[in-house]
A protein has these predicted regions:
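ATP-dependent carboxylate activation and anion-phosphoryl transfer catalytic cores
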Residues: 1-176, 313-316, 321-328, 332-335, ...
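Active-site nucleotide/adenylate-binding loops and adjacent lid/helix of ATP-dependent enzymes
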Residues: 44, 51, 175, 199-360, ...
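Conserved N-proximal alpha/beta basic substrate-recognition cap immediately N-terminal to
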Residues: 110-112, 116-252, 265
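Short polybasic amphipathic segments
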Residues: 188-193, 520-528, 663-670
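Short acidic-glycine loop/turn motifs at beta-strand connectors
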Residues: 194, 309-313, 385, 433, ...
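Extended, charge-rich helix/loop segments that form flexible
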Residues: 336-396
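Phosphate-binding loop of NTP-binding sites
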Residues: 479-619, 623-634, 733
Length: 734
């Protein structure tokens, strides 16, 4: 029988923390239809076909907990939603992306499943899931499937949409030290941290990288002159505009020479060890295509090295290797390149490969073609048995030598970066032995590069990977800096808008420029920027990217957590006012039907509380108090009276609480109490008369106290809140 396609009822991209995980995910709702009655062990040949197309599935542990765990589930019989989850993950891994997380859960309707998996980019995730369905259906119906074409297509999406390797290793290091990040573009411009504490990177450039310094480094002649003036060894050279001038300069300098574009990069257009007039003229032609002018330099004998300088220290170094082929008397040069060089797994077309493929018939292969011609060969030539042919002299910087760098060489490299003005620089050094001073080896610095590639240090072919991303993050942030500003998140259905405005006001009075995203609009430092509902992801993110803000307050709802996820990764204070009831929309769209399911949604706010932060919970609601165990930080309860079982138990254990006692709002820590103000105080009484709930007032006090706002300032702020925020008073009245 031919099975009908599994229906994808909805695919949703959750960009921030959600009920499943902290990371961005695809959440798909699917209808298995007749496939609900046909698990994997009920379809002849299904498992063999899936495993044949995707042998990497053996590495998926699944719930079994060990290698081959998912295959065990396949053999025992598992449903197609679960299989689509794992296939989606495997396809992304094959595309070079990361996707370590996934779940598949049946909802209350038979045959309807939620399938969830992590993705680095929405387009990649969506396309992977569509491909997963196609693979599952082909396996079920015993149809052919071109897995290679599918993976190639997904690789192109990943290369285009995901972070490049240099940026990714910095972001990974930031995440490791709990520093949040936001992608500001579809490219590699990334913000590390929030608000006024943020820093920005673009590949291996930072917001400390001077535009002037970058311009200097791209002008190789100017770079050399500045380095020479500071006593740093560089090869002498001349700028030329024609092939004739190139040959004249080569004779003046003395053969052999290096011919390269004045403003080139990545070694493109560079010819080394050129020692004939014909070679110089051909090299000039190749270099002229890559830059505005051409530079002729003295050839320095030795190996090429890349030394990475971050701040004022060397953090990594690699040595280059010459790419060669060995003749067999049968194969052509081009065939030998494909069989002996391009089969190296380190080589590829995508940015994630540390080495490029060598294609003689492409513009990037022109330098290799010239190298071959200098040895009297052509692509179709057949080298004799055992003859070694050099194909590429530069650009293969992939052997780690960090531990070998002589202190004097490191000092020269860091000085070169300072002279040019770069905070992060790739210093290209030619020397016969990097473990000896350059004076002894007659070595020299040949280039200083802004925005250096980091992949060679993260994935060297030989030697130890170096934590260069970590070094860059430590350069941007001090030892005790996380890039975070105080973030307050509020969820519930009882006066959360008013509460968010109260908390933002108190933060403002404490001296922090505070942003607020709530139902009433978007506020930046008490300026009302718009009256449209600003509780969603995009409006909230506007606050986090604003360099002027020292703190931010966010109101959210269960629906927004389910539809988008939260805009921030963690919060200093998480507040839950009550456990909302479900709604027809939540039932129909998300299958949230019970109080336990609603708790799973609301707990997201408390899951995000930082260890140094606090969960502020309404002790008058038992469903809310049960969330206390989920907080990584302190728990601070508030209640209308002290005579609350949860509050009493909490105080007995030395915890903090806020409650009303004999008409006074009271702060308590253990058995110590401080009366803050009386509810009959004129301005406070007016707020309450106008509709502000006592519990909302108590929640605001508790939040402010957890933010270390002084009690006297809390009292003063609440007294004049209504007067200074007339729009809030109007909201309460009407």
């Amino acid at each position: 029988m031919a099975f009908k396609d599994i229906q994808i009822l909805r695919m949703n991209y959750l960009r921030g923390p959600n009920i499943w995980t902290y990371r961005p995910i695809i959440e798909a709702l699917i209808d298995l239809g007749e496939m609900e009655d046909h698990p994997s062990n009920k379809i002849d040949g299904f498992n063999d076909r899936i495993n044949g197309w995707l042998p990497g599935l053996v590495e998926h542990h699944c719930g079994v907990g060990h290698r081959g765990g998912f295959l065990t589930r396949l053999v025992g019989g598992t449903w197609m939603g679960h299989i689509m989850e794992h296939v989606s993950i495997e396809l992304q891994l094959l595309a070079g992306a990361r996707a370590e997380f996934g779940k598949a859960r049946e909802i209350s309707k038979r045959g309807i499943y939620k399938v969830v998996f992590r993705t680095e980019h929405e387009e990649l995730g969506r396309e992977s899931f569509l491909a997963a369905r196609a693979i599952v259906m082909a396996a079920a119906n015993n149809l052919a499937f071109d897995i290679t074409a599918t993976v190639d297509r997904l690789k192109k999406i990943a290369d285009l949409r995901c972070l490049g390797p240099s940026t990714a290793c910095i972001v990974d290091a930031a995440v490791e030290r709990k520093t949040p990040f936001i992608r500001l573009t579809e490219g590699n411009l990334v913000q590390l941290g929030y608000g006024a504490k943020q820093r920005r990177i673009w590949t291996a450039e930072t917001d400390r990288t001077s535009a002037i310094a970058e311009s200097i480094s791209s002008d190789k002649d100017l770079t050399k002159r500045l380095l020479t003036q500071c006593g740093i060894p560089v090869p002498e050279g001349q700028i030329v505009k024609t092939a004739d001038e190139a040959w004249e300069a080569a004779q003046d300098i003395g053969l052999p020479v290096v011919v390269k574009p004045l403003d080139g990069n990545r070694g493109w257009g560079v010819s080394l060890d050129v020692n004939t007039e014909e070679g110089v003229r051909a090299a000039w032609t190749a270099a002229e295509k890559e830059g505005s002018e051409v530079l002729i330099e003295r050839y320095v004998r030795g190996d090429e090295h890349r030394v990475l300088v971050v701040g004022d220290r060397v953090v990594a170094a690699t040595r280059g290797e010459t790419a060669c082929i060995t003749g067999d008397g049968i194969s052509t040069v081009e065939q030998l390149i494909d069989s002996q060089i391009n089969t190296d797994p380190r080589r590829g077309l995508a940015e994630g490969f540390p080495l490029d493929l060598i294609r003689l018939n492409t513009p990037r292969g022109e330098m290799s073609l010239l190298e071959i011609q200098r040895q009297g060969l052509k692509p179709e030539s057949i080298p004799t048995q055992g003859r070694i042919v050099v194909v590429q002299r530069n650009g293969n910087l992939n052997n780690d030598v960090t531990d070998w760098v002589h202190p004097d060489v490191a000092a020269v490299a860091t000085l070169a970066a300072r002279v040019i003005g770069l905070d992060i620089a790739g210093i290209d050094i030619v020397t016969q032995d990097i473990s000896r001073p350059l004076e002894e080896t007659k070595g020299a610095i040949i280039e200083v590069n802004a925005g250096p590639g980091l992949l060679m240090h993260v994935k060297p072919a030989v030697g130890q990977p170096r934590p260069v991303g970590k070094a860059i993050v430590e350069h941007l942030f001090g030892p005790n800096e996380s890039g975070r500003i105080p973030v307050v998140g509020i969820v519930g259905s009882q006066q959360t808008t008013e509460l968010s405005q109260l908390v933002a006001w108190l933060l403002h009075l404490s001296g922090k420029r505070t942003g607020l995203a709530c139902k009433d609009g978007l506020y930046m430092d008490q300026q009302h920027l718009g009256k449209s509902d600003s509780r969603g992801f995009e409006a909230s993110e506007r606050l986090l990217i604003n360099r002027a803000l020292d703190a931010a307050v966010f109101e959210t709802t269960p629906a927004l957590i389910l539809d988008e996820g939260l805009a921030y990764d963690r919060c200093l204070v998480g507040i839950v006012t009550n456990m909302p009831d479900t709604t027809p929309t939540l039932i129909d769209k998300h299958d949230i039907q019970t109080s336990d399911q609603m708790r799973t949604v609301v707990r997201t706010q408390i899951d995000l509380v930082l260890p140094e932060g606090a969960a502020v919970l309404n002790a008058d609601e038992q469903a809310v108090t049960s969330l206390a165990e989920l907080s990584d930080g302190e728990v601070l309860f508030y209640a209308k009276t002290k005579d609350n079982a949860t509050m009493l138990t909490h105080l007995q254990s030395g915890g903090r609480g806020v409650y009303c006692k004999e008409g006074h709002v009271t702060l308590a820590r253990g058995d110590q109490e401080t009366q803050l103000f009386h509810l009959d105080l004129e301005l406070i009484a007016r707020l309450l008369k106008n509709g502000l709930h006592i519990s909302t007032l108590l929640a605001a006090v508790a939040a402010a106290w957890s933010l270390d706002i002084a009690p006297l300032l809390i009292r003063a702020g609440l007294k004049n809140f209504g007067q200074q925020n007339q729009h809030v008073a109007h909201t309460l009245q009407g």
